[in-house]
């Protein structure tokens, strides 16, 4: 069996994200066996075909150290030019494959038209991440004229022959919000965290709470910062709150609120950190915060591997998998309960006990994830 895997979206938007971590390890862990794979990319004059090994190299580029002024798209294009992948014409692609896999979210017309074409001829499979543009629209600002393609992507997610979801929550949201026929194949495969080497826990002199991710409303950065400020100003909390991640592209008021908290002290906001820098910052923290709505939450698994216990609340599928093994639900009843949570988990004894629960060997593996995707392709 031969499957084509469309990663055109990555070539046009190759910035390190949770989805691109999934793509990276889907390629790196694609098993040798009876399901052979080509990763399909756009090249001058048609499309290029990469082996899983080649695709793994390409998809690793966003996670490598680079100078701040280097445009990652230039690095990707240079890699493709040097790799000189096997080229085919668009019209010849259909004859090559027994199945077609779209492993990432894409609203590109070329990607969606290609998927539509394959859906008429061979089984089609998608990796489903979430339906958040449908359920959390405030977090998204689509380019003018793109709404029809956004709808087209979710139509395919509802109708593909098989969907591999990254969590039970994702599966349920696709079935209910997108009204996917439950008789169609739909499965769950948990992305891994074992790309991070295990580190021993450390405790800084003053407690540090770290939160990783872009400033999206669904991740509640403003609520976290306000609650922390209340704990500091009203209850004398001696701790630090560290935000790591990019600014909100959909709501400037979120960025302004976080900058205001930074100006008042005890709160830091680091943007543009490299992978290695992020890992060191998380490793050096007392606890990792994951609050709000996540389709999955790979950083939770990374934190546990890095020696840092996780405190979470809201929809947090990856954290739920690790309850009692490095993750603890806060049950803070929203923002009003967070100041008390900050005070409680600043206690060194509480943090030590929480750290002792960590079981970094228990995080899901990328090999297991890739195996489940291959099985879905085989059975589609």
Annotate the PLM regions:
Residues 1-380:
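Carbohydrate transferase catalytic cores enriched for Leloir-type hexosyltransferases
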